[in-house]
Amino acid sequence: MKHTFNRRSFLKLGLLAPVLPLPAFAGQLSSGERRLSLHNLHTGEKLDRPYWIEGDYVAESLADINRVLRDHRTDQVAAIDPQLLDLLHRISAAVGASKPFEIISGYRSPASNLLLTENTSGVAKRSLHMEGKAIDLRLPGIPLADLRQAGLMLKGGGVGFYPESNFVHLDVGRVRTWGA
């Protein structure tokens, strides 16, 4: 079934988001199962599976997600915060995603983050990527501006908008926004 994302979908989401607590809102989007579909652009790895079933996180799926979202520079694997996974699930549902998230950056080791801060502008020295609480991504078929808007409306954390680099940053830190 093809889902069409439009302004009406965002309006409905916007009307529901303030009145439902975040966990209750997540439950409204999925009855008994939360699934993620990911494609790491640096490693080529793909994953499409439920990570939460009937109120419990699935340990094997979480381990596989941690591996797919590892630091591609150092091959270091770290635990990804389940709140970030829940945020991705809610965003996927909000925009009616039919394709996997394309991952630019998931977990980032301190060594990789230091390298990026020295060679790239706009990289935070204390990035939430190093805690498994942030991700840079895009979603084929969904305009970046719509992905950004979904992140803003869900108020799950920080939303950075990088249209010149073709990605959106999402994290589960404090609610804030930056970028074009």
Set out the residue ranges of the language-model regions.
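C-terminal segment of N-terminal export signals and the immediately downstream linker at the start
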Residues: 22-51
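Active-site acidic/histidine clusters and adjacent loop/turn architecture
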Residues: 54-104
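Charged, often glycine-rich, active-site loop that binds/positions anionic groups
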Residues: 110-127
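Acidic helix-start/capping segments at beta-turn-to-alpha-helix junctions
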Residues: 100-114
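Extracytoplasmic/secreted envelope proteins and their assembly/folding machinery
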Residues: 85-89, 113, 144, 148
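N-terminal secretory signal peptides and thylakoid transit peptides that target proteins
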Residues: 1-18
